[in-house]
UniProtKB/Swiss-Prot annotation:
Function: Creates a 3 um hole in the egg vitelline layer through which the sperm passes. Does not have enzyme activity. Species-specific interaction between the sperm protein lysin and the egg protein VERL exposes a basic surface on lysin that may dissociate the egg vitelline layer via electrostatic repulsion. Plays a role in ensuring species-specific fertilization.
Protein name stated in the entry: Egg-lysin
UniProt note on tissues of expression: Sperm (at protein level).
Gene Ontology biological process terms in this record: single fertilization
Keyword Zinc among record annotations: no
Assembly with partners or alone: Monomer. Homodimer. Molecules associate into dimers and then rapidly dissociate again. Interacts (as a monomer) with the egg vitelline layer protein VERL (via VERL repeats); each VERL chain can bind multiple copies of lysin.
Highest taxon in the source lineage: Eukaryota
Chief location of this protein within or outside the cell: cytoplasm
Signal peptide: 1-18
Pfam families: Egg_lysin
Amino acid sequence: MKLLVLCLFAMMATLAVSRHRFRFIPHKYIRKEFEVALKVEIIAGFDRTLVKWLRVHGGRLSTVQKKALYFVNRRYMQTHWQNYMLWIVRKTDALGRPPVVADYSRLGAEIGRRIDMAYFYNFLNGRNMIPKYLPYMEEINRMRPADVPVANRGK
């Protein structure tokens, strides 16, 4: 009963605080070739960070846990795709010309480089929270970075 009351108060507080500040992030859509350039560079940056992190901290991890961390890279990109799009739209609008694939590759590489995934890996590893490796993770890991699904319905 106490837990129910606590959850109810937490929900009410969340609604009260977020009522005026929370905004839905509208979806931004881009053409397929731009999406592919972004995904390839973002995942390449995340994977480079993971390789460096595994070189230092990966000795204690099993092969399955390492595969799960590669999945975490892809899922992180999928989860934050629309937030990336807000930043990307702002950057491409600032160009003053129509963007090309190289612009999206450069922005994707910047995202992959700037996001501190090593902190995230340390967090997961330190708290023993690396997810169990499941069949759907294997499916996504086997995909080329260009084929990883994201919430984009561009042409």
